[in-house]
């Protein structure tokens, strides 16, 4: 996805990195519609889920979904998530999260989107993001209609 935002650098997104709990899932259960959306956009983007897997449900919930799951250990999760984004090539990453441990990946990625859903969002994550949405499904709306980003981020 290439998008030119007036007054900012051009975005060239090929990787989408999601946090799991509070972002793709609520209380460990995948939010309805997420699997279908990831599979729909998989020919255009490489999807990644990086998580501490608080509820131990991520592998089963994402079985059959076109994404790579990366479970990180406890301790310095924010640094682990940032490093993952950097390894992918941060200039090609859209990162999505809601937690305090997501703040560095949201800040590092070419585009960071914070979500405020049922589990809420850490203020640090919201402040680190370029965009804030009310639903993970809104993120897929940006993938389908990139000009929404232009309207939101133009200077």
Spans of features found by a protein language model:
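Non-catalytic pre-domain segments flanking phosphatase-related domains
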Residues: 1-18, 155
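Catalytic beta/alpha-barrel core
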Residues: 27, 49-50, 69-74
